[in-house]
Amino acid sequence: MPLHYEVHGPADGEAVLLSSGLGGSAAFWQPQLGALLEAGHRVIAYDQRGTGRSPAALDAGYAIADMARDVVQILDATATPRCHLVGHALGGLVGLQLALDEPARVASLVLVNAWSKPNAHSARCFDARLALLDACGPRAYVEAQPIFLYPAAWCAEHAQRVADEVDHAFAHFPGEANMRARIGALRAFDIDARLGAITAPTLVAAAMDDALVPWTCSQRLADGLKDVTLHFLPHGGHAHSVTEAAVFNRSLLDFLARVSAPGVPA
């Protein structure tokens, strides 16, 4: 099945591909889209296979490497030789895998609350989420989602927005089998021993109050990668690109401006 993707901005702009986390939706990046376009970038966003407008039944053995191949398919379809890949959580894992498998296609990486190997805390969180899905079904699963994504104070302050997001997530839930396959893929991901082989300049961004992925996972990425800019926020939660969008966008644009080669479109 073909993947749904969107291309925004000038044809000659530096290409930035946005890869979402577990939810898989291109819409996750709405807080970044305007800033990237204003900076002159050509922006590619997509719904990951088995989510949103890219419907598919995922096999139990579906892996991050399969998701990286999907990105190659999108780059080929959009005549994009290489891109700056911005990935949130699972999307960051896709970027790391792509940088290992197809290094010529990756101009730079931006890894937002990502990781290089499993950790016990995140495993416990995903165990709880799967148990909720198994025992109570999709509605309970999506009702709990904001607890893992956002700080409590932000959820309280933006209660209606959170409620609307939950309703939308339930209406577009990809199915229990697909969700289990996607969680299985991110839980199996472990390229920690290969971090040193990644040469693409990388921005590692994390919020230190992330309740799902410890900030130490981002520190580990920074320690293992060769060419790293590290940006920690004291707060913002797992989706700090949403809750602290202005701060995140400044860091993102500064990094992209620094690593973009003048006159050489990505």
From Swiss-Prot:
GO terms for biological process: acylglycerol catabolic process; nitrogen utilization; uracil catabolic process. GO terms for molecular function: hydrolase activity, acting on carbon-nitrogen (but not peptide) bonds, in linear amides; monoacylglycerol lipase activity. Gene3D superfamilies: alpha/beta hydrolase. It catalyses: carbamate + 2 H(+) = NH4(+) + CO2. InterPro entries: AB_hydrolase_1, AB_hydrolase_fold, AB_hydrolase_sf, Pyrimidine_utilisation_RutD. Residues 15-128 form the AB hydrolase-1 domain. Its EC number is 3.5.1.-. It is an enzyme of class 3 (hydrolase). This is Putative carbamate hydrolase RutD. It comes from Variovorax paradoxus (strain S110). The lineage of its organism: Bacteria, Pseudomonadati, Pseudomonadota, Betaproteobacteria, Burkholderiales. The gene is rutD.
